[in-house]
């Protein structure tokens, strides 16, 4: 039907006859001449119909979002009427004929006025929202990114192999989406949270290099960067080590950013241990564009009478830190400090102490804060020296249980960085390594990544003889601008070590056999050293397109309650279907 897309129409086609198809984006009547902006996925082109044209009445009857096909001759626009904002802006099409393919009702919101439209409305009419050039750009970028990744992995010897969607429920952290079996009454499949076990089994099978662009499912509480169904770039390889995975993935991600948005990353990426990340930034996914670091002042506060600081300073499970904001006296108002105090409270902090440094020459008198009177001058100036604080700087303090301080002050660091625009570069990719093997909660051990991550031991004897809380894992995360975009590890390839890890996690031998018997069996049949990584496609595209909402980069996303406003999923099903599955629905008591 068409000969050209809108973006193809330029001055090189002057005098040529073309056919375009698309939507009427805008219609204008100037002195009896009809101007139509025709939109397709590549952009806009201007179509002009003069009153003496046989199709003038048809052109005059067009309204926004009518779908049309038009023929005409490409002409240079009159001098001074060029539009530099569109690729076809130097030319226009003088219309010969036009055909209305389909009319449109008045759309629920104007594409140019989307910011004043509620997200619920945009999600209900997603097919309208996706007509916006901004949304089309994001999904086109997604397509380009996935194409690049496929080509890279194909060219590096990885095989695209599909794994099952109907699989066995296994305890991986989040709740599974369950699918009842009609043939096996009372039994359920689970939609996979990841292809973890299947990709490891492919390594046992000898495929050596695997990848898959795959949907995964987690029935968990949602936030701005989470969806119940999401897409992973899933990768696994045999006879390799951490260095192979990290260097190969650096090349892939650096190439991806250069190919899609023209950004060049220096390689190799910075590498930081988990312990350093937590110590300096309170987070295992720090945004290194923000030049703010924690300074540990625990020892300095141990002998002070100020219990807010000395209490945590003498508690092995707590920490005391300072965070210096250069020029913070002028940049941060009292109102902002009050807001930050409320902000850290979200993470469990009981308050937010601060000191304004007005004058260093005046000693304690030059420091402004409600807490200054409670701390000795010697200690105050030790802290000032440690933090390299200068006049007009402001110091924030975190004191309390280690997790609360890390979470609250880590979040505060990121918020201040954004509020004051402290970013000293556009991009900051890094690897975080040497994660703890386990984390403890409610007096029980949990896998920090997943139960198949290899510990940094060579034998089951080493595993038995090491305090589990001191074990490091062979895991690695890729972080870009404070987002964890990918995570992986070298896997356990020996059956006895895998069985012992299950045991340390409180999984009995019987439960391990029931849930993972097939995996334990496979590990006894000659399993190679192997490892891999998975990247969140949705998060990567968020970074590539500069959005903070994951729903912007998915064609048909769910809401934060995991519903689809357009199709009204989830929905009820008939009693007949439920009976076939042997399911009775228990009505929620109100």
Curated annotation (Swiss-Prot):
Primary location group: cytoplasm
Compartments in which it is found: Cytoplasm
Region (Aspartate) location: 196-199
Stretches that traverse the bilayer: none
Annotated catalysed reactions: tRNA(Asx) + L-aspartate + ATP = L-aspartyl-tRNA(Asx) + AMP + diphosphate
Gene Ontology MF terms: aspartate-tRNA ligase activity; aspartate-tRNA(Asn) ligase activity; ATP binding; nucleic acid binding
Protein name: Aspartate--tRNA(Asp/Asn) ligase
Provenance organism: Francisella tularensis subsp. holarctica (strain LVS)
